[in-house]
Amino acid sequence: MHLNKKYFKSYFLTGVFTLITVFYSCQDKTEVITNGAIQENIPQDIVEENLPQNFKIISLGDSYTIGQSVCESCRFPEQLKDSLILYFDEQDSFELEIIAQTGWTTTNLISAIESFNPPLDHSLVTLLIGVNNQYQGRPFSVYESEFIELVNIAISLVGDDPSRLIVVSIPDYAYTPFGQNFTSGYISDQLDNYNQYAENYCLENNISYVYITDITREGIENPALVASDNLHPSALAYSKFVERLLPIAIEKIQ
């Protein structure tokens, strides 16, 4: 029996096409015979799972960091930690270390950090210091030099990565019932000098600086922003601090 060349060519091409189709189909799935039954083993897209992360935060400062006259969970480092927990995956964990005490100056804070000797592997560090330098009448030159020293110490606590430091401005206690006992404008003018120095240094060295002083200057008009001691910020005031700190903190540790 002789096939017409035209039909032979057609049959040949059809056969080749079928073989190619079968070949590529086999590349997409394989069949495995188990206990006499054919099971299809279809490759699945590999989904990369996020591994649990542990973030370590350290906050350095004075009464504004330790949260004088508010509950432990009300102080701003705790509120910041809790806000980060809500933002990140449930499997992630956060640790918070605070080195701060009411009345501390820059000198006191430097000594305390040296004494505590915290590890250098933190994910984020905050620094808020200087009000007691002003209140105790320490020379401004002391703040100028020791603030820079504290910035460098803080950076060392996050693996020498300045992008993981947030400097927070000094609150203004002039706008509290206690602060009203002093000459109007005197406290605010001095604290402006402290904050301006810190802000300029941070700008020059590409360090994040968060200004919260204006929040505390609403304390007379809005007494809810002042704690029960008539001097320090309330939990509400600290929550407003965190509103400004949170997006920056997320960006730094994400």
Question: Could you say what each language-model-derived stretch is?
Answer:
Residues 2-15:
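Bacterial N-terminal signal peptides that target proteins for export
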Residues 22-25:
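C-terminal motif of bacterial Sec signal peptides marking the signal peptidase cleavage site
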Residues 27-29:
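Bacterial signal peptide processing site
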Residues 33-100, 114-120:
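Serine-esterase "nucleophile elbow" of acetyl-processing enzymes
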Residues 69, 97-105, 141, 182-183, ...:
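Acidic/histidine-rich helix-loop elements
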Residues 110-254:
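Alpha-helical cap/lid subdomain in secreted, periplasmic
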